[in-house]
Amino acid sequence: ATDLQAGYVADSNFTEAWKKVVPNVDPPKTPSAFMXP
C-alpha cells in the first residue's frame, strides 16, 4: 500500500510540475514510467 501511495504522490508532484512547465499540454497518464530509477 505504501508503494502505491508513494507512487501517487510522485505522480501528483509530476503533474503539478508539468502544468507549470507545459501548461498547454496534458501530462502523461503514467508519469511513473518516465521516472523509473
Curated annotation (Swiss-Prot):
Compartments, record wording: Mitochondrion; Mitochondrion inner membrane
Keyword Coiled coil belongs to the record: no
Entry keyword annotation includes GTP-binding: no
GO biological process, one term: ATP biosynthetic process
Domain of life according to the entry: Eukaryota
Alphabetic keyword roster: ATP synthesis, Hydrogen ion transport, Ion transport, Membrane, Mitochondrion, Mitochondrion inner membrane, Transport
CC terms in the record's Gene Ontology section: mitochondrial inner membrane
General function of this protein: Mitochondrial membrane ATP synthase (F(1)F(0) ATP synthase or Complex V) produces ATP from ADP in the presence of a proton gradient across the membrane which is generated by electron transport complexes of the respiratory chain. F-type ATPases consist of two structural domains, F(1) - containing the extramembraneous catalytic core and F(0) - containing the membrane proton channel, linked together by a central stalk and a peripheral stalk. During catalysis, ATP synthesis in the catalytic domain of F(1) is coupled via a rotary mechanism of the central stalk subunits to proton translocation.
Quaternary structure annotation from Swiss-Prot or TrEMBL: F-type ATPases have 2 components, CF(1) - the catalytic core - and CF(0) - the membrane proton channel. CF(1) has five subunits: alpha(3), beta(3), gamma(1), delta(1), epsilon(1). CF(0) has three main subunits: a, b and c.
Family under the similarity heading: Belongs to the ATPase delta chain family.
Name of the protein described by the UniProt record: ATP synthase subunit O, mitochondrial
Organism: Solanum tuberosum (Potato)
